[in-house]
């Protein structure tokens, strides 16, 4: 049985690519046709890729791999946070800060700073400071929560990055590839399938399309982790 049906993808608008002038020729094998100057993605091939992505992701989770979801565009931000949280993955959904992976030591220190500030806030320590100092600390806390809040549970570098919009998140792609971190990527018609291990050709701009694909990948991670836990109990 298919992980995602053709009708589900059609309803989500997963078949709509970009304008034909904004395409990457490497995506030609995933394109069905062009209509009114817009490329239409071959959803039969998307379904096959999605089956492969589900199995690959499930097996990675079963073997204990750690996941990071990345998607900072407005229409993906909430979905990224929601689905990553649902499957216990870390996430970046506001802005990719340079060095999030390649300068992990510094980034980890910033995450620890965030945790310290949260403890200070919850204990009332910040409220006891002079008004101006408290305001500075709260601004710092707010900024760190915005950009690093999704990474608080990430103690080590991830093994897999799940990506929405390869072009927008090009810095994340470069850092992951530099560190040999696997990439599972939603690929619109302007993307490069050679830059990821697990391609999923689909519309990466429509909220419903992003929700559908990330939702299934989160399901795969949860299923894989349940299998891993069951094996340990036995």
Swiss-Prot record:
Pfam families: Ribosomal_S2. Gene3D superfamilies: Glucose-6-phosphate isomerase like protein, domain 1 (3.40.50.10490), Helix hairpin bin (1.10.287.610). It comes from Prochlorococcus marinus (strain MIT 9301). This is Small ribosomal subunit protein uS2. Keywords: Ribonucleoprotein, Ribosomal protein. Belongs to the universal ribosomal protein uS2 family. The gene is rpsB. GO terms for molecular function: structural constituent of ribosome. HAMAP family: Ribosomal_uS2_B. GO terms for cellular component: cytosolic small ribosomal subunit. It comes from the Bacteria. One of its GO terms (biological process) is translation.
């Amino acid at each position: 049985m298919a992980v995602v049906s053709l009708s589900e993808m059609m309803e989500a608008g997963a078949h709509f690519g970009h304008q034909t002038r904004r395409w990457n020729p490497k995506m030609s094998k995933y394109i069905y046709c062009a209509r009114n100057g817009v490329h239409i993605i071959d959803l039969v091939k998307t379904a096959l890729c999605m089956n492969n992505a589900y199995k690959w992701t499930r097996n990675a989770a079963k073997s204990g791999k750690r996941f990071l979801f990345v998607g900072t565009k407005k229409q993906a931000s909430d979905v990224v946070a929601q689905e990553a949280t649902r499957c216990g993955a870390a996430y970046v959904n506001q802005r990719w800060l340079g060095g999030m992976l390649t300068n992990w030591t510094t980034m980890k220190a910033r995450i620890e700073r965030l945790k310290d500030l949260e403890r200070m806030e919850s204990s009332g320590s910040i409220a006891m400071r002079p008004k101006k100092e408290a305001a500075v600390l709260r601004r710092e806390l707010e900024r760190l929560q915005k950009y690093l809040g999704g990474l608080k549970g990430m103690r080590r570098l991830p093994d897999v990055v799940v990506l929405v919009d390869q072009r927008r998140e090009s810095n994340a792609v470069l850092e992951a590839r530099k560190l040999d971190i696997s990439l599972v990527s939603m690929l619109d018609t302007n993307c490069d399938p050679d830059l990821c291990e697990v391609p999923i050709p689909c519309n990466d701009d429509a909220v419903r399309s992003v929700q559908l694909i990330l939702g299934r990948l989160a399901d795969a991670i949860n299923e894989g982790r349940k299998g891993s836990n069951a094996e340990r109990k036995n």
